[in-house]
Amino acid sequence: MEEKRRKYSISSDNSDTTDSHATSTSASRCSKLPSSTKSGWPRQNEKKPSEVFRTDLITAMKIPDSYQLSPDDYYILADPWRQEWEKGVQVPAGAEAIPEPVVRILPPLEGPPAQASPSSTMLGEGSQPDWPGGSRYDLDEIDAYWLELINSELKEMERPELDELTLERVLEELETLCHQNMARAIETQEGLGIEYDEDVVCDVCRSPEGEDGNEMVFCDKCNVCVHQACYGILKVPTGSWLCRTCALGVQPKCLLCPKRGGALKPTRSGTKWVHVSCALWIPEVSIGCPEKMEPITKISHIPASRWALSCSLCKECTGTCIQCSMPSCVTAFHVTCAFDHGLEMRTILADNDEVKFKSFCQEHSDGGPRNEPTSEPTEPSQAGEDLEKVTLRKQRLQQLEEDFYELVEPAEVAERLDLAEALVDFIYQYWKLKRKANANQPLLTPKTDEVDNLAQQEQDVLYRRLKLFTHLRQDLERVRNLCYMVTRRERTKHAICKLQEQIFHLQMKLIEQDLCRGLSTSFPIDGTFFNSWLAQSVQITAENMAMSEWPLNNGHREDPAPGLLSEELLQDEETLLSFMRDPSLRPGDPARKARGRTRLPAKKKPPPPPPQDGPGSRTTPDKAPKKTWGQDAGSGKGGQGPPTRKPPRRTSSHLPSSPAAGDCPILATPESPPPLAPETPDEAASVAADSDVQVPGPAASPKPLGRLRPPRESKVTRRLPGARPDAGMGPPSAVAERPKVSLHFDTETDGYFSDGEMSDSDVEAEDGGVQRGPREAGAEEVVRMGVLAS
């Protein structure tokens, strides 16, 4: 040690210790100074460092890169070098502090296996067949000291010594036999004698009798007695049996009465418990599965009046009560209280296999009034008897545990293990002393396969129920989310419908305002046709277009107002709109006359065939002829249906004629500039014959021009203006030359609008209840002809 210290003092590079060790070396150097400098108190040179690290091992590992080594002489570190590794390797601070192991050489196990092999097949249930396999019991210090003592005595007696493995094996066999015999004693009359108690009754039906297939079963923990059918036991177990509450290790309180314990069954939720007897006697409660007598259902069906009843026996308002079956008696009591007080509880089996329950109070029970004074003294006595039974059971169990050694015979153990009986007796006496010192508790815990698996089954049931509740919770969460989304969707739909309704009412209001100002019903009020007309490049070229020069029906001449309106219509679109909404320019008598004359065709009389064919009298072969606006007005007034506005299909090279029975003027263009290229053969023919229009006589048949559509249901169709030549008119007057009017329709609509677009506004206008006079009708005809002329 001194040599190491001198080495540390010379060079610090080869030191094997840290700074803490260096302090001790410096102290040792100072100790070599003259004695005159030393103090009187002794220096602690023996103090050693608490930790020692060797750095020479790290230094020996490091070599320069230029050093020549073969690939087999070194290892390559894949991890990066850490700085804390430079600290070194920790070594023990003092070699004398290292504990030295103490070992013993055991003799070879040749003799005992050879002795036990012939009888190894004769071993019992709890013994191990092979010795070298080990034992469940491990020797402790007390066992080791006792083994030394017994070996010394055996040596004095010149007998073979006892080894540790044999001692462990014998103790394990004693514990196994004791556990088996004690379980058998508890289950039989020799142990407690409960099964043969004549006074015990079923906790559900209160019957002391059992029968084949419906045996009386006792719980091994709470000692409750039930019939198989009463508690829903499908198969009687061979070993011990525990009720539902004992299997789960709980002691719940009944939901319907204040009593704890007894034959309880869970509700559907599994969190509340109810006596089976309470479930049977309360009429609103039901049982889900009669075979298993669980779960208890329909607890919520119990009325509030029953929950409010107070028991006349226990004076508590807990749970629910039943009432006396006598018609004039309303005494209430709990079911379990009635059983404990010995009230009369009858179970009557009806003819239709229906069970009726009759319960009576103390007054109406058989012998109730006579036994009423003695009922109170018998209550403590009955409770005392029950307590005495329980106390007796506990005493017998305790006595059985104290006399555990009587359940094991040393000779049986010696025979099963093929050992000397005297040696087994020595171990047996030691086993009794050690177990007594352990408060009669077993030295070995029962095996896992020896534990009743009923509790595990109950745990599995609860686990499956928990999983079921988890899935149910998830399903309910999905349903909640779905309901929320459906509700949000319906709210959005409702808001959209309300918005559409508001838009509809606003449109109706605007339409009513327009109709009140005299807007024509044949004009598209919804604005579709009007907007399309304004979007076109309308070209109007006219020099002298006077309404006075137009031929009139039956030679009648119009008032000068229509002619003035026609001249104003040639200016521009804004003037057209202003005159359309001006109520001052309205003809009076002609429109009234036209309405009066249009009633004749409304009677559906077939007109005679036309005298001649012409371009203006062509009809579409697959379309029915339409009625004039005057017919619509007359029929609408007569209650045949609302007028339907259907604008005619116009082309750029043909102008319509006036209706047959009205006083509207006829537009004729004898001489016109070259028209546009016709789109259809019919239009080409109409253009060719446009300058030579023949007006038929009064008997001319209606032949509409252009695309006509059949009338819609429950509505009277309107005959378009210019659909056929004028009927009932005389020879036409001289007509002045008028230029050709070119009206360019939009290519998308082509001057045609569907029935849905036109008829909806008509229905809205009629629903508005706007009544138009005769002058308004005449003004509408003039405005319509003005639009056609433009």
Curated annotation (Swiss-Prot):
It catalyses: S-ubiquitinyl-[E2 ubiquitin-conjugating enzyme]-L-cysteine + [acceptor protein]-L-lysine = [E2 ubiquitin-conjugating enzyme]-L-cysteine + N(6)-ubiquitinyl-[acceptor protein]-L-lysine. GO terms for molecular function: histone H4K12 acetyltransferase activity; histone H4K5 acetyltransferase activity; histone H4K8 acetyltransferase activity; zinc ion binding. A zinc finger (PHD-type) spans 199-249, 309-365. Pfam families: EPL1, PHD_2, zf-HC5HC2H_2. Transmembrane segments: none annotated. The first PHD domain is essential for its E3 ubiquitin ligase activity. InterPro entries: Enhancer_polycomb-like_N, EPHD, Histone_Mod_Regulator, JADE2_ePHD, JADE2_PHD, Zinc_finger_PHD-type_CS, Znf_FYVE_PHD, Znf_PHD. This is E3 ubiquitin-protein ligase Jade-2. Residues 593-606 have a biased composition (Basic residues). The modification Phosphoserine is found at residues 9, 15, 117. The modification N6-acetyllysine is found at residues 32, 38, 298. The keyword Phosphoprotein applies. The gene is JADE2. Residues 1-52, 111-130, 361-386, 578-777 are annotated as: Disordered. Keywords: Acetylation, Metal-binding, Phosphoprotein, Repeat, Transferase, Ubl conjugation pathway, Zinc, Zinc-finger. Pathway: Protein modification; protein ubiquitination. Its EC number is 2.3.2.27. Signal peptide: none annotated. SUPFAM superfamilies: FYVE/PHD zinc finger (SSF57903). It comes from the Eukaryota. Coiled coil: none annotated. Scaffold subunit of some HBO1 complexes, which have a histone H4 acetyltransferase activity. Acts as an E3 ubiquitin-protein ligase mediating the ubiquitination and subsequent proteasomal degradation of target protein histone demethylase KDM1A. Also acts as a ubiquitin ligase E3 toward itself. Positive regulator of neurogenesis.
